[in-house]
């Protein structure tokens, strides 16, 4: 446990930030899973495209703001794009 007042404050701040970061990452995972579920369910292309765009938009935002590493964001975007393009061709 922190011994100084400033250390207590830093602990409170880091807990809040940690919770915020976890929420953002969880939201991203949910968006990606929703897109994958739509593809598995053979949903309409417009629905899948909407899910794809929202996931890519979230990846961009989190990558730029360093919530996830920029290279990881780029890699995930590439994976989602390949998944979407494969679905669009099969559709």
Curated annotation (Swiss-Prot):
Region Disordered: start-end pairs: 1-25
Listed Basic and acidic residues bias regions: 1-18
Protein name per the record: Small ribosomal subunit protein bS20
Keyword rRNA-binding: yes
Superkingdom: Bacteria
Keyword RNA-binding annotated: yes
Alphabetized UniProt keyword annotations: Ribonucleoprotein, Ribosomal protein, RNA-binding, rRNA-binding
GO biological process, one term: translation
A Pfam family matched in the record: Ribosomal_S20p
GO molecular function: small ribosomal subunit rRNA binding; structural constituent of ribosome
GO cellular component: cytosol; small ribosomal subunit
Family assignment from sequence similarity: Belongs to the bacterial ribosomal protein bS20 family.
SUPFAM superfamilies: Ribosomal protein S20
NCBIfam families to which the protein is assigned, alphabetical: S20
């Amino acid at each position: 446990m922190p011994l100084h007042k400033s250390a207590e404050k830093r602990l409170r701040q880091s807990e809040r930030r940690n919770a915020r970061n976890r929420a953002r990452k969880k939201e991203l995972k949910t968006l990606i899973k929703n897109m994958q579920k739509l593809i598995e369910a053979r949903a309409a292309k417009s629905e899948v495209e909407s899910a794809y765009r929202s996931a890519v938009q979230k990846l961009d935002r989190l990558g730029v703001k360093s919530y996830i590493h920029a290279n990881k964001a780029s890699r995930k975007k590439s994976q989602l794009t390949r998944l979407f393009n494969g679905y669009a061709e099969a559709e």
